Regions:
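RNase H-like (RuvC/DEDD) metal-dependent nuclease/polynucleotide-processing core
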Residues: 2-243
Length: 243
């Protein structure tokens, strides 16, 4: 539900954790002021541009989608992805899929995308390629004051005090492991975790809540970024993952 501003300055700022979902983007938002965070009911918003145009505007949008892409394929992907795998270690490192190069976004088939990616593209990234293209189309460098690439597994690593989680996120034990951490560390998390939305899974709700937790860290300027000295893509976008 959108808050009415009536031209007045709000006593809080809006934060959002965003993950791709069927029918659009799952948004877990919260009102934030100082030490207080109040999660709102999650919702699915159809297009990413509508999140950017949301009123009142989000102070931070932490999105689980690559921002900044290579022009040519590179073994093991962007430096931020290689660094993220190093941080997570085995076996959770496998959760970090390499982003496709920009040329792959125009592919109409998986085979074309694989060729544009230098012969390798994970099926996960192919399923996400339309979402990656949607973000790449609208993100300009100035948006990176507000919009940040995050990864839920890195968020959970931080939530668990620099400890990788034990179970894959889509298994029942993995879902419960993540819910337990979120309930302990994110005040009001149940409002997100207990939601029922068509086409949205429990693991997606967990991911969105974890991204929201990182959005609060970004707003509070306690976040770290991978790598510390990021690369820039051909469009002037920083290629980094924050946690």
């Amino acid at each position: 539900m959108r808050a009415a501003t009536h031209g007045a300055q709000l006593p809080y700022q809006l934060l959002a954790g965003v993950v791709p979902a069927r029918g659009g983007w799952l948004v877990a938002s919260a009102k934030w002021q100082g030490a207080t965070i109040a999660p709102q009911e999650p919702e699915v918003i159809g297009e990413f541009i509508d999140i950017l145009d949301y009123k009142p505007a989000y102070r931070v949008i932490a999105v689980f989608t690559p921002i900044g892409l290579l022009e040519e394929p590179r073994a093991k992907g962007r430096s931020c992805e290689r660094e993220a795998r190093r941080v997570l270690g085995v076996p959770r490192a496998s959760a970090i899929a390499s982003a496709p190069p920009r040329a792959a976004l125009a592919a109409s088939t998986y085979e074309e995308a694989v060729e544009a990616s230098g012969g390798h593209l994970s099926p996960i990234r192919w399923r996400q390629i339309a979402k990656i293209a949607e973000v790449d189309k609208v993100i300009a460098p100035y948006w990176q004051r507000t919009v940040f690439e995050v990864h839920p597994e890195l968020s959970f690593f931080q939530l668990a005090e620099d400890r990788p989680l034990r179970y894959p996120k889509r298994t029942q034990v993995g879902i419960e492991e993540r819910e337990e951490i979120l309930r302990a560390r994110l005040p009001g998390a149940e409002r997100i975790l207990g939601a029922t939305l068509p086409g949205v899974s429990k693991s997606q709700l967990n991911d969105a809540a974890a991204c929201l937790w990182t959005a609060r860290r970004i707003a509070a300027r306690t976040v770290s970024r991978l790598p510390e000295d990021p690369e820039w893509d051909a469009l002037g976008l920083r290629m980094e993952i924050v946690r």
